[in-house]
Amino acid sequence: MAMITPDSLRAAFPSEGLFADKEWLMSPEPFPLSPSLVRELEGLGHRLRLFLTAADALYARSVKGRLPEWIAATVDAGKPASLLAQSRSGAVRGQIPRVLRPDLLLGDEEGLAMSELDSVPGGIGLTAWFNQTYATEFPDVIGGGRGMMDGFSSIFPAGQGVDVVVSLEAAGYRPEMEWLATQLGRERFRVCEAETYAVDPA
């Protein structure tokens, strides 16, 4: 029976860690999912994109006064004016994030429940490491050993340099993004601090 030993997990774990100040309890095998649940997960991305597109349209119409004001007010609550101005600028208006990260709860009988829908790539490096590591003994793991890495890389134009910008507030995610950038190639991917980041005009 295939399994990942604690020693092999420790040996594969990056010395710099994957998530700052966290420790992990790891399983000797991947969490099993039924074929029907896998199909449901694989179809989730398209449905979530449609949901976000509709939500964005509702927000934009509310901002313009074509729908009730409370819609935009609810979305805008607690956000600084500078962020609101940037989010409403023509450069990003109507754009849907390329990374959608739902937080899913798996129930015994009722299937999946979504508690949050995020659009930042936190967790991609960690999940990619899990896939790479477990695929050594379980080659049929969902996505294979490189699925998460190749999927992340594919959202950017081929050959284009990619800056992964991490804020101090989200610094806990930086180790996994450093690991991911190394796996994908430092000549193309680099990790930068958001607070000091400047776009290279070249």
Task: Please annotate each region the language model reported.
Residues 1-202:
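Preference for protein termini
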